[in-house]
Design a protein with these regions (language model features):
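C-terminal catalytic domains of large/alpha subunits in multi-subunit enzymes
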Residues: 25-294
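Conserved strand-to-helix beginnings and helix N-cap segments that scaffold or border functional pockets
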Residues: 20-21
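Short, aliphatic-rich beta-strand segments
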Residues: 5-10, 165-167
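Gly/Ser-rich, acidic/histidine-flanked active-site/gating loops
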Residues: 13
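Condensing-enzyme catalytic core mediating Claisen C-C bond formation in acyl metabolism
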Residues: 1-6, 158
């Protein structure tokens, strides 16, 4: 915008992952402007009619990279405008702290001034089209490969078969991390989902095929008081296949937690000779497995 504010139109829709914050942060950090100066618009097919959607932990790696491509285009054109205003060559400029600066001097022009000039081109480079609007598409050169290790410690009540998680540790590698709080939130949510699948959640049918727990009144999901304190950490191995060096994190918690919980329970029952349990590991199933092993 002529005011120096930025609007991002994206084809990936957020449904709880915090795209609005992360995408705005990419642009704000790149241009040296405030987060309040960046507006993210998603789900608007009038402005962005095509988008491959939000799935596969791909939003930051694919959509974030497309945003970064547009950021680079803005900087490249902005350098030509700034060079005209500063009477130098674009190659003599470097962008830092929200300004194009002439190397080795104190001469500079701010991002907002360049944006205003781009839309009010009274003093403007010859043959340069006004405006600072760019659209970018990004096709990943390869897949990203996040990885991690999840450790679960459980206690099993021998009298009732009830499983209690006493400690849960997760260490994941999602490449460069844009927003640590959002990444941690994604891991927490995923781990909770995985614990729910392992211990609580399941469709129950009667002999006639009628679903018995079809509402949230009857379907068992984990509550906050069923969850332990999650201990999380990260290693950082930048992905070489995208400009941000990022990997997806949205599925890490669920992928790691379900087998970690089930394996921990089976390990706790190793003295009974239990080697397999069907999810969810309801107390009656665990108790029955122990009785059968006896």
């Amino acid at each position: 915008h002529p005011t120096g504010k930025v609007t991002i139109f994206v084809g990936a829709h957020s449904h709880g992952q915090g795209h609005e914050t992360t995408f705005a942060q990419i642009v704000a950090d790149s241009f040296g402007i405030g987060m309040d100066d960046v507006n993210v618009i998603h789900g608007d097919t009038e402005n962005v009619p095509f988008g491959m959607g939000t799935y596969g932990s791909r939003s930051i790696a694919v959509c974030g990279s497309a945003i970064m491509k547009s950021v680079d285009k803005v900087k490249e054109k902005g350098a030509r405008i700034a060079a005209h205003k500063l009477e130098c060559n674009p190659e003599d400029l470097e962008f830092a702290n929200g300004s194009w600066n002439v190397k080795g001097t104190e001469k500079s022009v701010g991002f907002g001034d360049v944006a205003l000039t781009a839309y009010v081109p009274h003093d403007y480079p010859e043959n340069e089209e006004p405006g600072l609007d760019f659209a970018s598409f990004y096709d990943p050169a390869n897949f990203v490969y996040p990885f991690g290790a999840h450790i679960c410690v459980v206690e099993v009540d021998k009298e009732t078969g009830e499983v209690k998680i006493v400690r849960y540790i997760a260490v994941d590698d999602a490449g460069n991390i844009i927003n640590p709080m959002i990444v941690e939130g994604q891991v927490h949510g995923g781990v909770a989902h995985g614990i729910g699948q392992a211990l609580y959640e399941g469709a129950v049918y009667d002999d006639s095929g009628q679903l018995l727990n079809a509402s949230m009144m009857d379907y068992c999901i984990p509550r906050a008081d069923n969850m332990p304190f999650f201990e999380t950490d990260h290693t950082v191995t930048p992905c070489p296949h995208n400009p941000l060096g990022v990997k997806g994190i949205g599925e890490a918690g669920t992928i790691g937690s379900t087998p970690a919980v089930v394996n921990a329970v089976i390990d706790a029952l190793s003295d009974y000779g239990v080697k397999d349990l069907q999810m969810p590991l309801l107390p009656q199933r665990v108790w029955a497995a122990m009785q059968q092993a006896k």
